[in-house]
Swiss-Prot record:
PROSITE patterns membership: HOMEOBOX_1, HOMEOBOX_2
Source organism: Xenopus laevis (African clawed frog)
Biased composition (Basic and acidic residues): 174-191
UniProt-recorded name of the protein: Homeobox protein GBX-2
Lineage summary: Eukaryota, Metazoa, Chordata, Craniata, Vertebrata
UniProt cross-references to SMART domains, sorted A to Z: HOX
Length: 340
């Protein structure tokens, strides 16, 4: 019975060859060409770069004898630490490199007995370098790049990309909600400014709340406290502010106040708005329009918008055609000469 079990025991003692002399070269075998994605074992106990370097995904390694023998060693002597078949990227190359170094140190007799410490150091280094690389590349990655990406957590376990994205989801959701609130606040301020601070020196903004409309308007509810509600869509598709229908009593009071004072203070505006049951914005816009019309009347150009002749034109005396202009000039010259 002992003779039957002796060849497997011999194979367990010397799994990598039949040579009696032990060396690192016999462990490694014929080393393959170093692929650009893997860590290359250089004979040191640990290959630790100072900065986390994001390496390109490794090509499929050639099926060589050394890797097959390494995996056989791994399955026979080191069951609790298999090489994870990761889908590629920086994490897979990092994990494979760490697994290779840990298995090599575990199979070396004597000198490297504390392989568990190196495994813990490898796990910690993998987690730290991974978190650093993730913080650097998080700004450049878009949300649409959801591939089969895995991450190593602090405990050494592999976390899929979707789980880490779900953990980051509430933070990003709060940021989106805050940006949405800011955008809504800016939109309200812009609409308020567009309604209140128009260019009242031009004629296009003069609405029906001008002074000289003494005819009675249909009494609609003039209480439009929100200036954002004053905008509706006309048939042409343009957003246009709805004109406020003032009553004759409101127009009369506004005219009286305007003749007394062209510019109102904030307290006066609030008092007038409270008495006339209007909003302060409506009183402000009415006074701005009224001042613009008053300045145009003062300048002598009332209806320049429609192209009609003004109501108070400058008096121009035309010269009749049948009058000889030379005779008029000669008469003026004679009169000037007759003066002393």
């Amino acid at each position: 019975m002992s003779a039957a079990f002796q060849p497997p025991l011999m194979m367990m003692q010397r799994p990598l060859g039949s040579s009696t002399a032990f060396s690192i070269d016999s462990l490694i075998g014929n080393p393959p060409q170093p692929s650009p994605g893997h860590f290359v074992y250089t004979g040191y106990p640990m290959f630790m770069p100072y900065r986390p370097v994001v390496l390109p995904p490794p090509p499929p390694p050639p099926p060589s004898l050394s890797q097959a023998t390494l995996q056989s060693t791994l399955s026979s002597a080191h069951h609790h630490h298999p090489i994870p078949s990761l889908p590629g990227g920086f994490c897979s190359s990092l994990a494979q490199g760490m697994a290779l170094t840990s298995t090599l140190m575990a199979t070396l007799p004597g000198g490297f007995s504390a392989s568990t410490q190196h495994q813990e150091a490898a796990r910690k280094f993998g987690a730290q370098s991974l978190h650093g690389a993730f913080e650097k590349s998080d700004g450049s990655q878009s949300d649409g790049e959801e591939g089969n990406k895995t991450y190593i957590t602090k405990e050494g376990t592999l976390l899929p990309f979707s789980a880490s994205e779900a953990s980051l989801g509430p933070v990003r959701g709060q940021g989106k909600e805050e940006s949405g609130k800011e955008a809504e606040g800016k939109g309200k301020e812009d609409s308020y400014l567009m309604d209140s601070d128009l260019d009242y020196s031009s004629d296009d903004n003069i609405s029906c709340q001008t002074a000289h409309k003494e005819e009675d308007t249909p009494e609609e509810s003039p209480q439009n406290s929100n200036p954002s509600n004053n905008s509706n869509t006309s048939s042409t598709g343009k957003n246009r502010r709805r004109r406020t229908a003032f009553t004759s009593e409101q127009l009369l009071e506004l005219e009286k106040e305007f003749h007394c004072k062209k510019y109102l203070s904030l307290t006066e505006r609030s008092q007038i708005a409270h008495v006339l049951k209007l909003s302060e914005v409506q009183v402000k816009i009415w006074f701005q329009n009224r001042r613009a019309k008053w300045k145009r009347v003062k300048a002598g150009n009332t209806n320049s918008k429609t192209g009609e002749p003004s109501r108070n034109p400058k008096i121009v005396v035309p010269i009749p055609v049948h009058v000889n202009r030379f005779a008029i000039r000669s008469q003026h010259q004679q009169l000037e000469q007759a003066r002393p």
